[in-house]
């Protein structure tokens, strides 16, 4: 796999508070290799390791995106909900930024039925005004609840190839479903997390909003660049030759 430069600078990570962990009393022993120091009673994440792991993960998602792999981003913290939705739309990823519905992946047959119903209701929106008020109100209420819980995955036709988990403790149900189905996971791991539960751990503060956005934006950039390469390589050869000769 080719190594690329993702402009991951230590000073930017410090500014985003990526390095700040939890109280040392909350440390997960398996996080010891990723911790470089402690400030008063707070563990400090080794940012050189964060930079290396993040860079390697960006290389991997670039390659995956260039091969057409599908991503699901899971981040339900209220403070990052809008950032998750915007980032996912930018990179053409599925996302969950509200409450995770238990069994969303492990009970995929039921989820598919819900998604089919959701898409059907979206198509029916135009005729809601022609329905009796009571019927229209029921459908609007159903549509509202489905949009809230499944809005970010409404066009997901099959299980994702890779899932990005932004908070191991907060999204543990989603992570457990991925483990059960052997879906590869990328995860921010704070000093109180278990790095062994995810396939690609990125040591980082998962409580600081700037930290989450910093990591997410790097991954999204890599996915977007991978998608762009896929678009270019999939063009007919005569078009690529014309562009090259310009």
Curated annotation (Swiss-Prot):
SUPFAM superfamilies per record: Ribosomal protein S2 (SSF52313)
Keyword Nucleus recorded: no
MF terms (GO), sorted A to Z: structural constituent of ribosome
GO cellular component, one term: mitochondrial small ribosomal subunit
InterPro entries: Ribosomal_uS2, Ribosomal_uS2_bac/mit/plastid, Ribosomal_uS2_CS, Ribosomal_uS2_flav_dom_sf
Keywords: Chloroplast, Plastid, Ribonucleoprotein, Ribosomal protein
Listed GO biological process terms: translation
Subcellular compartments: Plastid, Chloroplast
PROSITE patterns, A to Z: RIBOSOMAL_S2_1 (PS00962), RIBOSOMAL_S2_2 (PS00963)
Name of the protein described by the UniProt record: Small ribosomal subunit protein uS2c
Organism this protein belongs to: Pelargonium hortorum (Common geranium)
Lineage, broadest ranks: Eukaryota, Viridiplantae, Streptophyta, Embryophyta, Tracheophyta
């Amino acid at each position: 796999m080719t190594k690329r430069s993702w402009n991951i600078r230590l000073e930017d990570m410090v500014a985003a508070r990526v390095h700040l962990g939890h109280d040392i009393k909350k440390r997960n022993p398996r996080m010891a290799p990723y911790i470089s120091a402690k400030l008063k009673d707070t563990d400090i994440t080794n940012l050189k390791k964060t930079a290396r792991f993040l860079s390697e993960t960006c290389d991997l998602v670039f390659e995956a995106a260039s091969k057409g792999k599908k991503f699901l981003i899971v981040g339900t913290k209220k403070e990052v909900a809008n950032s998750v939705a915007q980032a996912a739309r930018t990179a053409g990823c599925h996302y969950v930024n509200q409450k995770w519905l238990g069994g969303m992946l492990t009970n995929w047959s039921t989820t598919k039925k819900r998604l089919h119903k959701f898409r059907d209701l979206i198509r029916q929106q135009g005729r809601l005004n022609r329905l009796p008020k009571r019927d229209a109100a029921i459908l609007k209420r159903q549509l509202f609840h489905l949009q809230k819980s499944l809005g970010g995955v409404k066009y997901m036709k099959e299980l994702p190839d890779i899932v990005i988990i932004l908070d191991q403790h907060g999204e543990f149900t989603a992570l457990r479903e991925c483990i059960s189905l052997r879906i590869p996971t990328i995860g921010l791991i704070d000093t109180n997390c278990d790095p062994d539960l995810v396939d690609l751990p990125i040591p980082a503060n998962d409580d600081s909003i700037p930290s989450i956005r910093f990591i997410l934006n790097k991954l999204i950039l890599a996915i977007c660049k991978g998608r762009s390469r896929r678009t270019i390589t999939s063009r007919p050869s005569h078009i690529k030759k014309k562009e090259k000769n310009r």
